[in-house]
Amino acid sequence: IRIAKECVKFNERCFVRLLGDMRSYNYVVDITPDIEGSQYRMRAIDFDQQSYEGRSSFYQPKYFKENNPIIFLGQEHMNVPTMVQYQMEERSLIANRIKASMRRTNNLFKVMVKDQISNPEKVAQLREELSYHHKTDVFDQCDSMGSLVYENLKLVLAKDFKQSTTTFDFPRIE
């Protein structure tokens, strides 16, 4: 169950920062022994698809068939409220990390919003899909991937923002 819990958190980390293509061969599972058994942490090892693609599902590891075994494990052992709880925990951790490094984060976003990370068609597609996913129009003025990442991060980390918490209750991909 711990690995399934970490999968929910990893999916959230990838989606919040728009890190794409996290198939099972693009991340590692870091296992740390502890008093209760082992702690698991999924860590990305391939960053070439950071904020480039236009499809929002590309930024959610749960949609890659290579990840199905671990996704199905989570579906089997966790209910939706538990998954949402883990998503909210991860958002809280991300918010605390950002607060601890606010100046560096601001400097990074100053560069990202000006950089042409992707082409205009993909920016437009992702802008539309994020607006639909989050049920908001905050992305309407975004004209770069950097500004989409910034607004996505701001939105998901906003206190009490819960409408976009996603679950793993999607059709099986064979």
PLM regions with names:
Residues 35-174:
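C-terminal catalytic region of ATP-dependent kinase domains
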Residues 1-59:
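Conserved kinase catalytic-core segment
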